[in-house]
């Protein structure tokens, strides 16, 4: 189990990402616009740098919904490989069963 503080930190990051997503996207469009003046582009870079570091989507880490485990995360289920296996063995995931060949 991950510490509660780590789970809370990831939740805080998720909120920041959604809060600043539009603003970050607009600034990135302005920065990559070759028709904009150099001064406008540079000001956009400075504004982007002034945003909170955790508002970047690349700072987020996918974590298991049950345990908070950061490694072995399966996006399709939102769980770590360990919890997916446990749920599979109990028959809690429809259509998923242990491989046999």
Curated annotation (Swiss-Prot):
Q: Which GO terms describe its molecular function?
A: rRNA binding; structural constituent of ribosome
- Gene of origin? rpsN
Q: Which UniProt keywords apply?
A: Ribonucleoprotein, Ribosomal protein, RNA-binding, rRNA-binding
| Transmembrane regions listed in the UniProt entry | none
What is the protein name stated in its UniProt record?
Answer: Small ribosomal subunit protein uS14
Spell out the GO cellular component terms annotated for this protein, sorted alphabetically and separated by semicolons. cytoplasm; small ribosomal subunit
InterPro entries of this UniProt entry? Ribosomal_uS14, Ribosomal_uS14_bac/plastid, Ribosomal_uS14_CS
Disulfide bonding pattern of the chain: none
Please report which protein family the annotation says this sequence is part of. Belongs to the universal ribosomal protein uS14 family.
Role summary:
Binds 16S rRNA, required for the assembly of 30S particles and may also be responsible for determining the conformation of the 16S rRNA at the A site.
Quaternary structure and partners: Part of the 30S ribosomal subunit. Contacts proteins S3 and S10.
Q: What processes in GO biological process is this protein linked to?
A: translation
Q: What is the lineage of its organism?
A: Bacteria, Pseudomonadati, Pseudomonadota, Gammaproteobacteria, Vibrionales
